[in-house]
Amino acid sequence: MWLQPSLSLSPTPTVGRSLCLTLGFLSLVLRASTQAPAPTVNTHFGKLRGARVPLPSEILGPVDQYLGVPYAAPPIGEKRFLPPEPPPSWSGIRNATHFPPVCPQNIHTAVPEVMLPVWFTANLDIVATYIQEPNEDCLYLNVYVPTEDGSGAKKQGEDLADNDGDEDEDIRDSGAKPVMVYIHGGSYMEGTGNMIDGSVLASYGNVIVITLNYRVGVLGFLSTGDQAAKGNYGLLDQIQALRWVSENIAFFGGDPRRITVFGSGIGASCVSLLTLSHHSEGLFQRAIIQSGSALSSWAVNYQPVKYTSLLADKVGCNVLDTVDMVDCLRQKSAKELVEQDIQPARYHVAFGPVIDGDVIPDDPEILMEQGEFLNYDIMLGVNQGEGLKFVEGVVDPEDGVSGTDFDYSVSNFVDNLYGYPEGKDTLRETIKFMYTDWADRDNPETRRKTLVALFTDHQWVEPSVVTADLHARYGSPTYFYAFYHHCQSLMKPAWSDAAHGDEVPYVFGVPMVGPTDLFPCNFSKNDVMLSAVVMTYWTNFAKTGDPNKPVPQDTKFIHTKANRFEEVAWSKYNPRDQLYLHIGLKPRVRDHYRATKVAFWKHLVPHLYNLHDMFHYTSTTTKVPPPDTTHSSHITRRPNGKTWSTKRPAISPAYSNENAPGSWNGDQDAGPLLVENPRDYSTELSVTIAVGASLLFLNVLAFAALYYRKDKRRQEPLRQPSPQRGTGAPELGTAPEEELAALQLGPTHHECEAGPPHDTLRLTALPDYTLTLRRSPDDIPLMTPNTITMIPNSLVGLQTLHPYNTFAAGFNSTGLPHSHSTTRV
């Protein structure tokens, strides 16, 4: 700020007026001479003009912003529902000083609050200002380039200042800067990179930060399950953006060999999926996965055809031929498509990434087990109270949860996620048992805490820990954190812990510049200090793959108190020790984050869920149709009179009985929902005893046959068989063993002989049902490398129409990693 000089003499009016004009003119000249010219940069597609923006903090240097840079051609008209193409070139200098339009979306209908960050759902009116003018021409990115080395570029002398002549150690990057590409979150239905300002992170961490838009919802993830509309356009947009970055970031001073992709929530799920796709190979080297995973129940849509049909019904395009259906959908306006309210099963998504055999070749857990992501350095973690939004609606005025509401919440969770009408009782009671604090079971506040922990563990912690285990199993660099801090604001209850999305403002340095419209927090010095710590960890990881170096934790320039993180060394994660960093005001390295609950969800629950099937397996392979959980949502009444919008799965026709006594009618007054008639297990017990006795009898017979055969062999040397018998001896010699094998395997073979090989019941070991539990109750594995054809009848024989060929020549459909796998050797 320029200050006017003071004069000791009192000039005459004329002289004073002339002096003021002269000083004003000189001030304008000085401002113009000191103001940096607008930065320009060349790219492979043309020149860009950005803007140099100062930041409201003395420790942050200015940042060059290039906003609205096209990374792909507009996906409009016939290009709707197709992979992106490179952007066209332009002549002259393109102005890149304004945010681009956002992709079409609708936040005015019911949004899935449980999947969205708190700062998003609490500020929907503010969010609406960012998406006022959506446009299908939305594939743009924003680039934030630091112009000076941030405060983290030097290791300060003992006084931590530069004004006394102490010599500071220069630890800045001597060459090109690391690049951090942020994938915004949401629920695959909403969001934009324009909401996140990367300036502070870029300036403080001395890295280039990029945010981007990608197609969301119907336009980004609609799939017909075949070549007509294969889906995953939103993921392909992200891949195209990474391709643009790797080819052009050097013009901005960035290092294409040090690109880190990071995201939170659904953005983290996208990052996790990108590490598993061979299309991403070579486009980035590191990934930061914040509060999300490809293993979460909502990361992948296992029923794309179902929701596409629902959409086609609503807009009058439901025809049998999928090519005609997609052509019809292309004729509809984007507004008409995104305004259709199609609600998925709870804990799942209607439009999201699909297993197409190419972009996502197989189930994410299978790909992780095959090592498809081992070539990437990965840092991941969760927040302490991610499940806040699942519980907030059932908390009473005294900040507690009643026993009835607790029971209802668990039952609703089991009904919606597991869905089958039989075999749920044991599972439901076991979950309630595991999440009851038996030392304080009647305390409503304790019930609230354990209920939040239930949803946090199932939807975030277990998928993240399993992802970390699979990645670190072969020594790939892995770092795990648990975030335990949040800012003070009115966006959520006072009793809440660090909820979903609460780490985002600290990652982007919001506390350093003060509250914003999306983060209206009362930031303290502790918040500023913790934000500096987080940005140092994140940018260190982007620079070296190690969050501990090259820049040490040093924040005395912010806070007079000692930074406890200076004494903490963030250890690598491994499946045995499972070390993780507790990020909070009292940091420490701990081990085995919520290990008991993770083991419960990973190992015990899948078997409890299928106990009924194991003991009641019929002799036919015909499966009872699962319940449909995607009918229009309705308001369910709870015993205390509160309402909870949900979608209870309908009972399967094989089990439903409309006139059965005790059947629930939505028009009746709500009574105790969880009171059930005592169940008589005598029949099941009798059948079990009978089967056990039969197996015992068969084993006795088998043992007798074996003993008889052994005794017969002992006496054989004393006998000389006749030539006729001698010729048949080999057959007789093997018959008892074959009979024994038949007796031992008889029950299994008999139970499954009518079914195909893949449906054979194996009683020797419990099958792994964890993949099933991520799918909605009525999911059927639709697309895997071994089963998918992705070619409708009307398209058989057509040649490849696009460079993103889902089934190129030599497509590997085996269970082994692809020939182009990113598996680390």
Swiss-Prot record:
UniProt cross-references to Gene3D superfamilies, sorted A to Z: alpha/beta hydrolase
Disulfide bridge partners, by residue number: 103-138, 317-328, 487-521
GO biological process: axon extension; excitatory postsynaptic potential; inhibitory postsynaptic potential; long-term synaptic potentiation; modulation of chemical synaptic transmission; negative regulation of dendritic spine morphogenesis; negative regulation of excitatory postsynaptic potential; neuron cell-cell adhesion
Keywords from the named record: Cell adhesion, Cell membrane, Disulfide bond, Glycoprotein, Membrane, Phosphoprotein, Signal, Synapse, Transmembrane, Transmembrane helix
Biased composition (Polar residues): 622-633, 654-666
Highest taxon of the lineage: Eukaryota
Protein name in UniProt: Neuroligin-3
Lineage: Eukaryota, Metazoa, Chordata, Craniata, Vertebrata
